[in-house]
């Protein structure tokens, strides 16, 4: 299925986009526009669609996500080992599950791919830099503020913690005793 590939699908897409715009312009309550979503996330029951869009936009603007997502793909990627070596280390369970706040300088054992755009950001064997860590911190904080609208990042592992909340990790190569880092 590809959106808008035929005239019929194109018309459906345009109709749905127009309906979304109308609902946004009139600030329809989310319980009316997305009833199944609100049933799963009742905290949005009294929120209007335009209000939610404005809150999400403000958070993206506050963190200059358009610039950050460009910078992270253009940032200096430091290969620390061959991808095959990182995979072998993972296969032999020579990995640590590292929290986001401790990732800078660590070597990923996983492919790290944010969606969108679905382009790999790091491949196994590359080091996390401060720009990538800043993006992952934003994603973690955004996910906490807007449950149900979580950022999808392949390679970022989430675990529920007792008492509510979520912690995020990436599997990294264990530091070698003889080499400089992991």
Per-region residue spans from a language model:
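Non-catalytic terminal extensions of PLP-dependent enzymes
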Residues: 2-182
């Amino acid at each position: 299925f590809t959106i808008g590939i035929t005239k019929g699908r194109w018309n459906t897409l345009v109709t749905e986009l127009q309906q979304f715009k109308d609902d946004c312009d009139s600030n329809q309550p989310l319980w009316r526009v997305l009833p199944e979503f609100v049933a799963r996330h009742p905290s949005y029951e009294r929120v209007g669609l335009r209000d939610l869009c404005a809150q999400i936009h403000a958070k993206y603007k506050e963190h200059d996500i358009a610039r950050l997502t460009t910078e992270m793909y253009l940032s200096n990627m430091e290969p620390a080992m061959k991808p095959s070596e990182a995979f072998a280390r993972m296969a032999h369970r020579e990995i640590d599950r590292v929290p986001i706040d401790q990732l800078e300088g660590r070597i990923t054992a996983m492919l790290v791919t944010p969606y969108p755009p679905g382009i790999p950001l790091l491949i196994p064997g590359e080091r996390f830099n401060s720009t990538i860590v800043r993006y992952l911190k934003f994603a973690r904080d955004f996910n906490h503020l807007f449950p149900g609208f979580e950022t999808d990042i392949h390679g970022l592992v989430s675990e529920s913690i007792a008492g509510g909340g979520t912690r995020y990790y990436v599997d990294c190569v264990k530091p070698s005793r003889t080499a400089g880092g992991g």
